[in-house]
């Protein structure tokens, strides 16, 4: 598998090689909870499921660049798992910093439980206090689990953790991202069962989500570009491989440029505003590269026997799952140093 990003140091290269040996097993995920759980458990056993969380919380303590490499490699084969891992990272950051949910944090590290992380004021989130009961709905969560916990980032410094028992979940159809086990969620949670996590760095959690989304999108773009180049090298037309045609080579170069752009912005992101920009750019790059890769396969690009059409569907669904437009308001406020007002959900009855 091609690495389209900056030169890797030996530790990063070893991690990429290890994950390549795992992801090249040609395991195509479906919405089968047993196979998903098996892969998550394997990633957890390898220490990469929560690689970027702090050692004090039980994680791998890897820096952002090492985590970026891991997520990009995982997303080449299983982007739904990469996105689920990103949400687990963000949730552990929040919960461990506040000393909340110690048992849940341990289970998240081991892949035994899952969590969906959403923004309280996102367009697909509709939650409000009704007396002592938190009610409402989230139209989409993608946690690679049938019954995840729900962590709601509510304004600055506050998050709410909701148990699976207080959630009614229903399957949701989507374009791609197989293995995400996408669900809609109806919430009816008594105040006493909602864990209010206060005094935490929710801006850092948002940056973690967006930065991880960018790395996942870069993985999709890289896989699509590699697939198109491989097909063009093997497919013979007019007496030789397609790569002998200058226009084909230029198209492949454009795809590689898009993959390189995606990983470059993911690699460089740090703050909430820069991570928002990275996620937006990388998700768009992934869709563009994957769409071009389908065209590079000709009519075969639309057949499920080839991965090209799956990469395009995955890119589209990841961009929808990340909800880039909803994060732009807070990223803009963070950019200019504006402190948002206390979110209504943070004002518990």
What are these regions (language model features)?
Residues 1-84, 335-349:
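Amphipathic, small/basic residue-rich leader segments at the start of a protein or domain
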Residues 2-5, 297-349:
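Glycine-rich phosphate/cofactor-binding loops in nucleotide/flavin-utilizing enzymes
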Residues 24-34, 229, 233, 237-240, ...:
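C-terminal helix-coil-helix/basic helical segment that borders enzyme active sites and/or dimer interfaces
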Residues 69-76, 93-99, 223-227, 267, ...:
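Short glycine/serine- and small hydrophobic-enriched flexible loop segments
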Residues 82-100:
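N-terminal glycine-rich flavin-associated loop
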Residues 105-226, 340-349:
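FAD-binding core of flavoproteins
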């Amino acid at each position: 598998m091609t690495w389209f990003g900056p030169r890797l140091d030996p530790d990063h290269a070893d991690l990429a090689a290890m994950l390549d040996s795992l992801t090249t097993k040609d395991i195509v995920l479906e919405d089968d909870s047993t196979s998903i759980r098996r892969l998550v458990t394997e990633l957890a056993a390898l220490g990469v499921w929560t690689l970027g969380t702090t050692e004090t919380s039980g994680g791998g303590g890897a820096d952002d660049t090492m985590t970026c490499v891991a997520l990009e490699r995982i997303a080449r084969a299983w982007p739904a798992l990469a996105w689920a891992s990103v949400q687990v990272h963000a949730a552990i950051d929040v919960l461990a910093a506040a000393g909340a949910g110690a048992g849940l944090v341990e289970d998240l590290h081991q892949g035994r439980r899952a969590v969906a992380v959403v923004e309280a004021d996102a367009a697909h989130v509709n939650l409000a206090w009704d007396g002592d009961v938190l009610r409402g709905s989230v139209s989409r969560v993608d946690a690679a689990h049938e019954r995840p916990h729900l962590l709601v980032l509510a304004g600055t410094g506050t998050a709410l953790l909701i148990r699976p028992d207080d959630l009614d979940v229903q399957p949701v159809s989507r374009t791609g991202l197989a293995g995400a086990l996408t669900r809609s969620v109806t919430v009816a949670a008594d105040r006493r069962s909602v864990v209010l996590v206060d005094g935490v760095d929710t801006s850092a959690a948002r940056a973690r989500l967006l930065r991880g989304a960018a790395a996942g999108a870069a993985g999709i773009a890289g896989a699509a570009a590699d697939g198109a180049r491989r097909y063009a090298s093997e497919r013979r037309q007019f007496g030789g491989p397609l790569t002998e045609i200058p226009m084909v080579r230029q198209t492949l170069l454009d795809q590689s440029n898009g993959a390189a752009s995606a990983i470059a912005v993911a690699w460089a992101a740090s703050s909430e505003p820069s991570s928002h920009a990275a996620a937006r750019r990388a998700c768009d790059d992934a869709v563009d590269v994957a769409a071009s890769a389908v065209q590079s396969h000709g009519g075969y690009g639309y057949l499920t026997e080839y991965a090209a059409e799956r990469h395009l569907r995955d890119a589209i669904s990841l961009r929808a799952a990340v909800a880039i437009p909803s994060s732009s308001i807070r990223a803009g406020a963070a950019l200019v140093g504006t402190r948002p007002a206390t979110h209504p959900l943070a004002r518990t009855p």
